Amino acid sequence: MSNPRPNPGIEAIHPYIGGESKLPGVEQVIKLSSNEGAFGPPPAAQQAYLKAVSSLHRYPDGGSHALREAIGRYFGLDPARIVCGVGSDEMIAHLCMAYSNPDSELIMSVHGFSVYEMYGHYAGAKVVKVPEQALTTDVDALLDAITPRTKVVCIANPNNPTGTMLPTAEIARLRASLPSDVLLVLDAAYAEYVDDPDYDPGVKLVDAGDNTVMTRTFSKIFGLGGLRLGWAYAPPAIVDVLNRVRGPFTVNAAVQEAAIGALEEPGWVERSRAHNSAARAKLATALFDIGIPTLPSVTNFLLADFGSEARAGAADRWLRTRGLIVRRVASYGLPAYLRITIGTNEECDLVAEALRAFMAQAPADSDAAS
């Protein structure tokens, strides 16, 4: 007698492991491992969430109508082309499942966000990872990987975990060169942090055609990671597909109210972005001065190069003993790097001071520092 077996591809999935938030024996922990907003949730979001508590016995608006209207007003988008879900990763999962199959291929960058591979395997598709140039998505490599079986291309722009971005012209070139029946998913989770004028999160391409989707999140600059809310902006036909496959009440009522409050907090994004840009530049300079180069980043994190896996591991252990949690990225094929979230000024200073002490005592390629 045989046991139940999952669909092909499921056993190829490596479960996603989020950034740690606690350390054994350490009371005061500073978490800089998950790229969460430095300032927490906006006050208006907190107030709206608490106000919603008295109505928790009511089912939420399954279509998130008021929230979609608020998103549309804030970003200047048509609410009818917005779909909300439990994090942008849920939107990406639905897109991969709806447009991929066991006879198809999903294309992604070799150091792209790991959920693309996860959901590609979930759909049974062959996942093809293409090389990058200087840890930046390579459009020519993506195009070279396209075959008649390709159905979905997933790109994070800016990319996690590298922090690098493709300019508007390169993304437009990618879309123009892809076959029209290939869905391009642009994951713009970090869009609000970008202050480069040569950047578009994907709105223009979504508006221009029928085969591109942009996904966004409230988990980063809006500080609502614990509530899990994301959204997609898509052509009408793809919106119809997402509304067919999404759950009926996935976005709960309190989350919808909190997100509307976050959008209504005056100047929140502008203040957060200004802080992030200044703190990121300061930390990058401090790390460079002690011999730790970082990749050029437009996000709320830095990818720091320690030169070897041994030294990166030693630095991580050194930070952990001091209550500082950053992110190992060996699972992304980057064993010599640590990803460091941009926190408050004080938190960034503590990281710089701790790593200065580490570099002062650590021999080259040491794995013994503690």
UniProtKB/Swiss-Prot annotation:
Catalysed reactions, as listed in the record: L-histidinol phosphate + 2-oxoglutarate = 3-(imidazol-4-yl)-2-oxopropyl phosphate + L-glutamate
Residues annotated with N6-(pyridoxal phosphate)lysine modification:
K220
Its GO biological process terms? L-histidine biosynthetic process
Give the matching InterPro entries: Aminotransferase_I/II_large, HisP_aminotrans, HistidinolP_aminotransfase, PyrdxlP-dep_Trfase, PyrdxlP-dep_Trfase_major, PyrdxlP-dep_Trfase_small
Supply the alphabetized keyword list: Amino-acid biosynthesis, Aminotransferase, Histidine biosynthesis, Pyridoxal phosphate, Transferase
Q: Which Pfam families match?
A: Aminotran_1_2
Its pathway is: Amino-acid biosynthesis; L-histidine biosynthesis; L-histidine from 5-phospho-alpha-D-ribose 1-diphosphate: step 7/9
Identify the EC number(s): 2.6.1.9
**Gene Ontology MF terms:** histidinol-phosphate transaminase activity; pyridoxal phosphate binding
- List, separated by semicolons, the cofactors it needs: pyridoxal 5'-phosphate
Q: Which family does it belong to?
A: Belongs to the class-II pyridoxal-phosphate-dependent aminotransferase family. Histidinol-phosphate aminotransferase subfamily.
Quaternary structure, per UniProt, is: Homodimer.
Task: Report the protein name in the record.
Answer: Histidinol-phosphate aminotransferase
Gene from which the chain derives? hisC
